[in-house]
């Protein structure tokens, strides 16, 4: 597979962005956040509304995340099982958009046998829906994130990207 080359080539074009093969598309519906999962229905340009998911590969240049990225206590308090939310919103807080390569492969890369039993996906997206709880925890902790995401959505809609 050439997934690393695809990410690296995209990084050379966009050195100040996080490049990810798979993203969750965030949008607003009746004033509430909603998502399209799976990595195939994506925004046509780099945006804060691409919630990166690491399961298919993501490249983080060293200067694109907020200084709070290493605040382990805050991470454990706000979204301990949702590292994708943490990394994504630390990028957004730093003013870093997430781009998806044109040749992205959003298929998850799994190590044989690791998906048996509880997984982060089953913990976060089913049952208690920890994904949405933790997302809201982060918006409550960092209110500027909510404003940034809503303004970005308005910009994307005005630009005809939806």
Model regions: which residues?
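Conserved catalytic core of nucleotide-sugar-dependent glycosyltransferases
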Residues: 2-73
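C-terminal catalytic/acceptor-binding lobe
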Residues: 72-162
């Amino acid at each position: 597979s050439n997934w690393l080359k695809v990410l690296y080539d995209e990084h050379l074009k966009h050195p100040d962005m996080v490049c990810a093969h798979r993203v969750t598309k965030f949008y607003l519906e009746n004033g509430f956040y909603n998502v399209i999962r799976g990595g195939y229905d994506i925004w046509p340009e780099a945006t804060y509304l691409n919630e990166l998911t690491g399961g298919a590969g993501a490249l983080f240049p060293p200067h694109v995340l907020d200084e709070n990225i290493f605040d382990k206590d805050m991470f454990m308090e706000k979204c301990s099982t949702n590292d994708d939310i943490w990394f994504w919103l630390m990028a957004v807080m730093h003013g870093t958009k997430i781009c998806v390569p044109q040749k992205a492969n959003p298929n998850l890369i799994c190590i044989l046998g690791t998906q048996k039993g509880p997984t982060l996906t089953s913990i976060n997206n089913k049952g208690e829906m920890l994904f949405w709880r933790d997302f809201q925890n982060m918006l409550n902790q960092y209110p500027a994130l909510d404003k940034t995401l809503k303004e970005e959505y308005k910009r994307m809609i005005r630009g005809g990207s939806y």
